[in-house]
């Protein structure tokens, strides 16, 4: 009998040996993809400028996840932080990628073995000789092992007790590096931006999982609960597993999009809310004001701003600016950033300082408007010059640059002032190389946007998968046919009212 494509998994429904085989093959595919993708990214990655051309600008997807776990060095002699390294060993990008590919090959061979040798004594009930799995016991084993792994990650890897630690950075993503993290056991551990919570929660969840696993290994479920939740049905396992996966996908979609200690901006790029709230702009202004209050000139104050911090304050790095269906890395949009030109300050002929109103995230075009400190519009680039009152030419706007490549330079000609006013709409002003990658000028999203979009969609699909398989396993007896007790109810002439047990007729002799 031929099976339609959506029914092919029926063949492993009552075949534990081959159920293991297909799971091993799935693990082989996942590990093989991860290792191969890492090697591909390493082949195209340019490590020369970690400040203005970081991995998230280049569209790296696997590398940020490797880096946040403590992998920073390459066999090519470079490091994510820009330093040169020698003999990084196995704990390197290439070493971990190759170990995944080797694991993939081993799982592939194991899958073939289990497919061929599917009928093992292990899978048969010794009392009946029938294929049978003790699913509650298997659940306990898995829970115990995953708890052990969770505890080990939190207690050893993250804390640096036996491992490198994780990627930790400051609130503005400037000073990040891999370092050991002490667990935060207080209320502060629940702050999503506190890396100490990662260590504490893995330790706590791991201990809980270990004890829960031991409980399920030693305590049998009550018969009523066993039957109510269909604990003997393999499709119950599928349904609950899908629930765990879609829940994890929903949670990580949130931590990725809104930001968290687990998704540092140095590795995944800034969040859209940091642009929306002027997060970096406010910090830059605070640092400049502090420097000026210390006696530095405005030019010196702006020169102290790190290029890395200024680059975050640019709309092209906002993951919400790139359309979801614009393929390619951010660098294919606006180009490869080469230099910060500095902070432009505009002035009209009366000497008033003017600020260009910044473009909101969801606008493709936005009027160029220059306002004074009170928010009053003093200049603009008009749509119709014939009716203009506040044009750059009429108001006599000039622009001075502080910090960056154009530090100390002043521009007075209207075309140049307009050019920089348009650039200032997008945040801090940068120089881009658009020829090397044939960049088209259309913004792209960062790996942060792609991850969120993908996992939110997968979570939704898996949610429906959970409902589907949960419904199938709970109502299995209804779907598989009519039971013996139902036959009497619907027998013609047995009841005055069909199917109503209270109207049973007296049998004639």
UniProtKB/Swiss-Prot annotation:
Membrane topology recorded in Swiss-Prot or TrEMBL: Multi-pass membrane protein
Family assignment from sequence similarity: Belongs to the PsbB/PsbC family. PsbB subfamily.
One Pfam assignment: PSII
Entry's transmembrane regions: 21-36, 101-115, 140-156, 203-218, 237-252, 457-472
Name the record gives this protein: Photosystem II CP47 reaction center protein
Entry-linked HAMAP family: PSII_PsbB_CP47
Gene Ontology CC: chloroplast thylakoid membrane; photosystem II
BP GO terms, sorted: photosynthetic electron transport in photosystem II
GO MF annotation list: chlorophyll binding; electron transporter, transferring electrons within the cyclic electron transport pathway of photosynthesis activity
The record's free-text note on cofactor binding: Binds multiple chlorophylls. PSII binds additional chlorophylls, carotenoids and specific lipids.
Function: One of the components of the core complex of photosystem II (PSII). It binds chlorophyll and helps catalyze the primary light-induced photochemical processes of PSII. PSII is a light-driven water:plastoquinone oxidoreductase, using light energy to abstract electrons from H(2)O, generating O(2) and a proton gradient subsequently used for ATP formation.
Keywords carried by this UniProt record: Chlorophyll, Chloroplast, Chromophore, Membrane, Photosynthesis, Photosystem II, Plastid, Thylakoid, Transmembrane, Transmembrane helix
Gene assigned in the entry: psbB
Subunit-level organization: PSII is composed of 1 copy each of membrane proteins PsbA, PsbB, PsbC, PsbD, PsbE, PsbF, PsbH, PsbI, PsbJ, PsbK, PsbL, PsbM, PsbT, PsbX, PsbY, PsbZ, Psb30/Ycf12, at least 3 peripheral proteins of the oxygen-evolving complex and a large number of cofactors. It forms dimeric complexes.
Protein location: Plastid, Chloroplast thylakoid membrane
């Amino acid at each position: 009998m031929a099976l339609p494509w959506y029914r092919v998994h029926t063949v492993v429904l009552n075949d534990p040996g081959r159920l293991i085989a297909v799971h091993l093959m799935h693990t082989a595919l996942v590990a093989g993809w991860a290792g191969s993708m890492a090697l591909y990214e390493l082949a195209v990655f340019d490590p020369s400028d970690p400040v203005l051309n970081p991995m998230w600008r280049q569209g790296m997807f696997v590398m940020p996840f490797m880096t946040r776990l403590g992998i920073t060095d390459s066999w090519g002699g470079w490091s994510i932080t820009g330093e040169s390294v020698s003999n990084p060993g196995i704990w390197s990008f290439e070493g971990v990628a190759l170990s995944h590919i080797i694991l993939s090959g081993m799982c592939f061979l194991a899958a073939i073995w289990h497919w061929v040798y599917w009928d093992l004594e292990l899978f048969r009930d010794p009392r009946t000789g029938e294929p049978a799995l003790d699913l509650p016991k298997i659940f306990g084993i898995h829970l115990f092992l995953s708890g052990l792994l969770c505890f080990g990650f939190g207690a050893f890897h993250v804390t640096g007790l036996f491992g490198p630690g994780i990627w930790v950075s400051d609130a503005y993503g400037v000073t990040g590096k891999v370092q050991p993290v002490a667990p935060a056991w207080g209320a502060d551990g629940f702050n999503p931006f506190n890396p100490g919570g990662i260590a504490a929660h893995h330790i706590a969840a791991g201990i809980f999982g270990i004890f829960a696993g031991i409980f399920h290994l030693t305590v049998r479920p009550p018969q009523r609960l066993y039957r109510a939740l269909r604990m003997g049905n393999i499709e119950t396992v599928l349904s609950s597993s899908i629930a765990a996966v879609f829940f994890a996908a929903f949670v990580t979609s949130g931590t990725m999009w809104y930001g968290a200690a687990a998704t540092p901006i140095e590795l995944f790029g800034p969040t859209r809310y940091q642009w929306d709230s002027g997060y970096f702009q406010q910090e830059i202004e605070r640092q400049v004001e502090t420097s000026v209050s210390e006696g530095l000139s405005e030019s010196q104050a702006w020169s102290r701003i790190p290029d890395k911090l200024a680059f975050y304050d640019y709309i092209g790095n906002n993951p919400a600016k790139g359309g979801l269906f614009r393929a390619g890395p951010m660098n294919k949009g606006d180009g490869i950033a080469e230099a910060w030109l500095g902070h432009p300050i505009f002035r009209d002929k009366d000497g008033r300082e003017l600020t260009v109103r910044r473009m909101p995230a969801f606008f493709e075009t936005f009027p160029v408007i220059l306002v004074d400190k009170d928010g009053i519009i003093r200049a603009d680039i008009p749509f119709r010059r014939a009716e203009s009152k506040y044009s750059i030419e009429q108001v006599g706007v000039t622009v001075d640059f502080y910090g960056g490549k154009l530090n100390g330079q002043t521009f007075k000609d209207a075309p140049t002032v307009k050019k920089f006013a348009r650039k200032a709409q997008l945040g801090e002003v940068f120089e881009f190389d658009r020829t090397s990658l044939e960049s088209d000028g259309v913004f792209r999203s960062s790996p942060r946007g792609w991850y969120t979009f993908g996992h939110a969609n997968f979570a939704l699909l898996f949610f429906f998968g959970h409902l589907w398989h949960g419904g199938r396993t709970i109502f299995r007896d209804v779907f598989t046919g009519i039971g013996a007790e139902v036959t009497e109810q619907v027998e013609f002439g047995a009841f005055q009212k069909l199917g109503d047990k209270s109207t049973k007729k007296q049998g004639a002799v």
